Amino acid sequence: MSGTATEEQIQAICRSADAYLYDRKAGGYRLNTDFKEEKFDLGRMFGFAYGEKENGAVFSHMAVMYANALYKTGHAKEGYKVLQTLLDTAMDFERSKMYPGIPEYFDNQGRGLYAYLTGAASWYMLTMITEVFGVKGQLGDMVIAPALMPEQYDQEGKASLKIEFAGRKFSIHIFNREKKEWNKVQIKEAFCDGTLLSAEGGRQARLKRSEIEKLTLEKVHEINIILN
């Protein structure tokens, strides 16, 4: 997330996490493997049974931060796997035994616990907005660089997001009619209320701050991004 790891190290981290920590039944990526010993002198982590809380549970907050870091470093497919596994587990009531939402952690059976005691939900939303849909602020401008997977588009090849930015309301629509992979497409055209936006290198669209300030506060402004 800090940009410290090299590309080679990131790939090694992904391979290791998949090999040692990923457990679909439990709900995703565990915090650690089973050390098979109790080490109370190392703090509360090793005071729990394996699969509970900080000792090897699928800890939602850390999993979402891992996903965020993967998206930031250009590994959207791997990041999507982290987010989607959490969502699938939470929405499977027979397994999670909880109302729809993101719990603090999932235990060995995939049961969600402590639905209120986590920052994962806010990090999940942050990642969906700023990394998956790719909507960010940059020196006052709005930039949009989507990294959506083909399965995240509807039948018409459309994915939508409603947000507020700089006090204005926006409805953002990403069109990928052929549902190509995120790194196989470029931004062909981008519009805000019918006005053409710049598509920088085909990777991101930009709505400048000076243009945002001209937009009315009451209206929901429509941004359309066409990928090809």
Positions of PLM-derived features:
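Non-catalytic C-terminal accessory modules of carbohydrate-active enzymes
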Residues: R15, A19-K25, D34-D41, G47-G56, ...
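His/Glu-based metal-binding/catalytic segments typifying zinc-dependent metallopeptidases
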Residues: M1-E8, I13
